[in-house]
C-alpha cells in the first residue's frame, strides 16, 4: 500500500473516541494497483458492516473503493496472518500503444512468445534465493521466498503473468517480468531465470518492468482463520471469472 493511500485510509476510517491505525496485506509501489487489498483496523465503535463499507467509501476518492468487510479475530493481522499473495502483471503486446488503458497495462512492442515465457518461469517455482530479483533498496533480512506457482498465458494481444508466493521482495514481481520479457522476445534463453538464481546478483538481470501493469489480485489466509471475503479479484477490464 502506497504511503499516501495508507494515510488517506486512516483519515477516512475515523473513530470519534480514538485514532485508528490500519494495516494491509501487501505493500504496493506507486503506480501499482490492487483489486483485492486486505486492510484491517481495530475500533470500539459498533456499526453494521454495510454502514462501514458505504460510510468509508463516501470519504474515499474514486481511485479507492471498499468492496466488502468482515469481523475478524483480535489476533488477526492482514499482513502476518497471510499464507500467500497473488499478483497479476498485464502486458499489451503490440507495436501500437493503447489509448484506453495505458495506466493499467505495460505495452511491449517486441513480439513475445508466451509459451517460452511460461516455460522459463517454471524455474522460479519453489523456495529459492531471489537475490537477483530484489531491488537494491530492499530491506528484507533474507532473499529466500517460496513461489507457489507461475503461469504465463495469452489472450489476443494481452499476455498475463500470474504469480503466487508466500511473500515477495521489493520489486520482485516486476523484476521477474522484466526477465521473462527478454526471454519472450528471444533475447535471452529459456534457462535465463535459472542462471540468474545461481548468480545472486541483481546487476546481471534484466530491467525492472514498469509498475502500471501490476495488480495485487489475491491474498489467502490459513484455513483456521475464516474470513467471509473473496480471495481472488481479477481486474474488471479483463473479463475473467473469479
Residue ranges and their predicted role:
Residues 10, 14-242:
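Structured-RNA-binding interfaces characteristic of tRNA pseudouridine synthases
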Amino acid at each position: 500500500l502506497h504511503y499516501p493511500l495508507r494515510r488517506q485510509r486512516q483519515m477516512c476510517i475515523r473513530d470519534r473516541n480514538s485514532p485508528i491505525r490500519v494495516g494491509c496485506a501487501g505493500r504496493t509501489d506507486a503506480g501499482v494497483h490492487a483489486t483485492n487489498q486486505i486492510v484491517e483496523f481495530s475500533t470500539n465503535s459498533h456499526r453494521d458492516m454495510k454502514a462501514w463499507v458505504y460510510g468509508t467509501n463516501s470519504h474515499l476518492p474514486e481511485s479507492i473503493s471498499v468492496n466488502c468487510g468482515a469481523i475478524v479475530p483480535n489476533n488477526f493481522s492482514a499482513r502476518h496472518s497471510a499464507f500467500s499473495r497473488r499478483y497479476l502483471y498485464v502486458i499489451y503486446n503490440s507495436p501500437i500503444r493503447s489509448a484506453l488503458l495505458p495506466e493499467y497495462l505495460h505495452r511491449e512492442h517486441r513480439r513475445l512468445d508466451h509459451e517460452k515465457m511460461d516455460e522459463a518461469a517454471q524455474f522460479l517455482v519453489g523456495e529459492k534465493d531471489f537475490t537477483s530479483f530484489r531491488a537494491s533498496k530492499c530491506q528484507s533480512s533474507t532473499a529466500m521466498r517460496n513461489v507457489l506457482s507461475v503461469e504465463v498465458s495469452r489472450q489476443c494481444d494481452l499476455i498475463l503473468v500470474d504469480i503466487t508466493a508466500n511473500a515477495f521482495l521489493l520489486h520482485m514481481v516486476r523484476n521477474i517480468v522484466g526477465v521473462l520479457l527478454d526471454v519472450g522476445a528471444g533475447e535471452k534463453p529459456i534457462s535465463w531465470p535459472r542462471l540468474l538464481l545461481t548468480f545472486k546478483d541483481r546487476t546481471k538481470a534484466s530491467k525492472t518492468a514498469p509498475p502500471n501493469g501490476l495488480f495485487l489480485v489475491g491474498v489467502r489466509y490459513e484455513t483456521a482463520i475464516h474470513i467471509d471475503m473473496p480471495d481472488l479479484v481479477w481486474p474488471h477490464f479483463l473479463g475473467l471469472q473469479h
